Amino acid sequence: MAMLLNQSQPPQGREGGGTQVGSLGPGIPVGQQQQQLGLQQQQQDFDPVQRYRMLIPQLKESLQNLMKIAAQNLVQNTNIDNGQKNADGLVQRFDKSLEEFYAICDQLELCLRLAYECLSQSYDSAKHSPTLVPTATKPDAVQTESLPYTQYLSMIKSQISCAKDIHNALLECSKKIMGKTPNTQGGL
């Protein structure tokens, strides 16, 4: 764990001068490096796969701690049952370490659910809109299967129109069902 902490911290430069040669490039001011590192950290927090990868070592550590505390408690309870005095009167609480373990498991479950939802949306997007619009960040790059923006807009408008038609059909159907429901109840 200490090795991970050492790798994530930018190297310290000499004092003086407003710039430092760091891990992000030579001549970049320290404040800018910290800001870029902060942005990278925020991006990793939003990515469920990266978050999952970060939580796995914590889960392993928590499980090891949980097993260690369980073993200590078992030894202490065995000594008490055998009538032996225990010199280690201070044993950590099992319930707190179990709660920590379950909290990490819950976070992992949320990350997996979010990753699954992102993947499902990506598949649905590729299925219903398989062609891409050229990105503004790379106007020089030629994308073979891309649509011009005007065609993309017309496709989106047709999808919205279809969704509205489905919505209206469902509303009409529900009104018909509601209209028939009082008649069948009145006949009873």
Curated annotation (Swiss-Prot):
For this protein, the record's InterPro entries field holds: Mediator_Med29_met
Which Pfam families does the annotation name? Med29
**Entry GO CC:** mediator complex
**Domain of life the protein comes from:** Eukaryota
Query: In which compartments does the protein localize?
Result: Nucleus
UniProtKB keywords:
Activator, Nucleus, Transcription, Transcription regulation
Q: Where is this region: Disordered?
A: 1-27
Spell out the Polar residues composition-biased ranges.
1-11
In UniProt terms, what function does this protein have? Answer: Component of the Mediator complex, a coactivator involved in the regulated transcription of nearly all RNA polymerase II-dependent genes. Mediator functions as a bridge to convey information from gene-specific regulatory proteins to the basal RNA polymerase II transcription machinery. Mediator is recruited to promoters by direct interactions with regulatory proteins and serves as a scaffold for the assembly of a functional preinitiation complex with RNA polymerase II and the general transcription factors.
Q: Which family does it belong to?
A: Belongs to the Mediator complex subunit 29 family.
PANTHER family from the UniProt entry:
MEDIATOR OF RNA POLYMERASE II TRANSCRIPTION SUBUNIT 29
Q: How does it assemble?
A: Component of the Mediator complex.
- Protein name (Swiss-Prot/TrEMBL): Mediator of RNA polymerase II transcription subunit 29
Show the taxonomic lineage. Answer: Eukaryota, Metazoa, Chordata, Craniata, Vertebrata
Quote the gene name from the UniProt entry.
med29
